[in-house]
Amino acid sequence: MAAGGQGGYVFEGSDGVVSIEAEHYFCKRDAKEACWTNIPHMGRTLGAMALMPYTKPTDGAELTYKFGGIGGVKTVKVHVVVKSTLDFQVKGGMTYEVSLDGGDAVSVNFNSRLNENPENVHSVYYPTVARRVVESTVTLPVGPDSPHTLTLRPKDPGIVFEKVVVDAGGYVPQFLFGKESGKRVAAGRR
């Protein structure tokens, strides 16, 4: 595992899609006692980002991603792909927040049913563990300015982010969640 790198990436979507590997963030903010860490080769395509250590609070931590090239759409569907982490705190699921362009954050509880309860074991638990990821989708309004800023905020420790896909109407579901979109490093970021 490695510290979370330099950031500064700005993505350019095409055909109504922006696909972003979690480790290619624009900016990261660590929690007071936990730092963003890149986990190479975790995930289906490149790596993943998680706060370490898992035993510390996540208050104030966030990853931000910048992107353009989605046209004049009013809303987008944001697909967030995380590792299929179990609710090891046994609190009814683990959550993160997603926001776009400074708008209201949407809370996502991605693993509330990822357990061995009889009603979930065959329909949710086994298939999810076999896939090794959980994909959650939220619809968010798009601000007027580009590049756009997408923010992920873990509310619980142990969440491992693998990929983000912004769908402005062109995304076709696929196993690897699309080839990563073109990117550049913002001036003055390296």
Regions flagged by a language model, labelled:
Residues 1-190:
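Extracytoplasmic
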